[in-house]
Amino acid sequence: ALAKHPLFLEGAFEVQDEGSQLPGYLLEPKRGEMVVDFCAGAGGKTLLLGALMKNTGRLYAFDVSDKRLANLKPRLARSGLSNVHPARIEHERDTKIKRLAGKVDRVLVDAPCSGLGTLRRNPDLKWRQSEDSVAELTVKQAAILDAAAKLVRPGGRVVYATCSLLTAENDAIVAAFLAKHPDFSLVPASAILAKQGI
């Protein structure tokens, strides 16, 4: 198994599917920048961001769950990255977030979602989601995206992603955000990825 391969144990690679990698490449973090992974979870995308930053700059890995951040610790140790700073937050208005207002170059929001884009791997999800639960999630997603936008300096970048296929959790969230924040503009993912040869 890959998890027992010497190169994996040395931190030379992580296992991650394409859909999980793309948000990191869309964020395009650079060496020496200040970057926030707003909903870091167990840190798969965090590790990619840290590697793309060439282990320089400062990368904050925020999450509301101690358990998920605890799962990041061994992965972070294995990776050898020293630019990652995991921190538990209470919510998107936490003082740890507010103190970074206007100082951050790039923010990744991999928002909590219904997960309905992962039905192939998690077929039981379709029975656990309802219109009400999705509506509740969209309120949370919009609040997180608004909070993330306050962090970026002028000219910075925010990438919003979910693993849902629902318009309500994606296009509608982004459209409402752009209507509320005319100082932000939509950049086609294809243009960013093409520039990187992806």
Task: For each feature predicted by the language model, list its residue ranges.
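S-adenosylmethionine
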Residues: 1-198
